[in-house]
Amino acid sequence: TAYDYSEIEYPDDCIVDFDMRLIDLFREMDKKSLSIQERIKQEYYRVKELLDGKVPTRMELFTNMDDNIYEYCMKHSKENPFKRYMDFLYEIHELSVEELQIYSGIGREFLQLIETTDMQKVYKMPILYGFYNEGDVRLAVTDDEVVESWKKFFDRGTNWKDFPKVTSYEEYRKITDKQHLSKAKSMPIKFLKASGKGFFIDKDGYALGIRDELADVIKVDAFKKQMKDIIEYRTMEYYRRRYVEN
């Protein structure tokens, strides 16, 4: 006759340990049967649960995401939610009413542009911070505003190390405002105008402007939050990547 295993008395902790290992095994089996898109969604919902049901920002999703899943996202741009976060949220019905209004208009196109703009260096980020302006988003930035935002960005931590040929913070501090502005205009400002899908434009009296059609949407809170989140995430990801590569 078959042996009745239920008659064996295991120590309580043994049963618990066995149960937990079995649950882990089932979880691993589940993961393997899921498509990578489903795994990313599952990870999103896990992070959302950690945040007590709050929709994660890009920064929050990055901070709490499983390292292996994040690395996969970085290597597979097609499935990477950080390259098209509003699209990702739209597909899983997680956009707020205000975000849906942005999503259906020109604001989404602009956010998508700054989310995906090429970044060999970090130089575009202080320019975008100049436009963001602590939440009072500008349609154009003057030379002085560019220099102010640029220096504020590179004064922080070791960000100054992004300047080639500058070997110390003291040496960085010797760079003049005129030199900073020249670098900003010859590199990020030039490239934003060239590859900005017509969003970044010349404006009389300003170092750089964005299209007037954005005048209404830049006042919307949801737009401001998205813009800030994109700039913060892209800055952080740039430095993470640089750290890993070095």
Predicted regions and their residues:
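Mixed-charge, low-complexity interaction segments
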Residues: L50-N246
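Long, largely alpha-helical accessory region at the distal end of helicase-like NTP-driven motors
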Residues: A2-F88
